[in-house]
């Protein structure tokens, strides 16, 4: 049966030549209750409603169309429901299975509690595993490099590199003891200028009380053994004249352990360890450790200069604040 279609209605022309942003909706035709529902022209299909009847057409083909169409719509809904049925029961199953979440570029110091606090808002966290890469982090690698490649320990505690001559000026007692472990001299030098008490004083006194070992004769047996703590024959030594600008050494009390010195070169000692020249420290070391108790009238300022009562500067210059035995 031919269906009457209304003429197509076009939207009104745009005003001022400006096209409208949105096209107006197509007008709906007036409903016709004569048994046929008109269809807009843009739809290319005919809709059938279950209440629609065609009594004027006795044909069996046309009479079965509404029934078939009515049955097709529920079948489509059932098919959609059937297709979606496996999806709904599968959601709880998928939620029950734990998901593995990989997170990269987390801070180096993050641990399990930190990650649980960060990602716990998205669901229950069963386990947290932190995997470090093979290189390790930059901070950890640098720390390991510092710890493994240790430099040799500096022999001086405060990092100073002391010249033996300078060190002898500041701490001559330590340089006079040959059995003293010289690489650790800086430890004793660090104590200079301080009043030693307790542990430091005990260490200092231990080094100070150790006598030097016997010297080794080198140039001449009688000449180099003059400072050994045992009687040495002095008959073979001749007096040595001094230059006019050099003052003679003060007279010391005579004793078998410390015979009178007639030549300045007789005070040289060669030590066994060879850490420094004996010509520099020999006389002073022997004076410090071989001086008897009877020589209390003369005192030293720990710089190698000996002041006696007959010194013209004795009344003006007193003993300086030193680090020798007398001031301990």
Swiss-Prot record:
Compositionally skewed regions (Polar residues) per UniProt: 49-87
Keywords: Cytoplasm, Methylation, mRNA processing, mRNA splicing, Nucleus, RNA-binding
Region annotation Disordered: where it falls in the sequence: 1-106
Site feature (Interaction with RNA) residues: 100, 108-109, 133, 138, 145
SUPFAM superfamilies: RNA-binding domain, RBD
GO cellular component, one term: cytoplasm
Omega-N-methylarginine carried by residues: 192
Gene Ontology MF terms: mRNA binding
Compartments where found: Nucleus; Cytoplasm
Record-given protein name: RNA binding protein fox-1 homolog 3
Organism listed in the record: Bos taurus
Lineage, uppermost ranks: Eukaryota, Metazoa, Chordata, Craniata, Vertebrata
Name of the encoding gene: RBFOX3
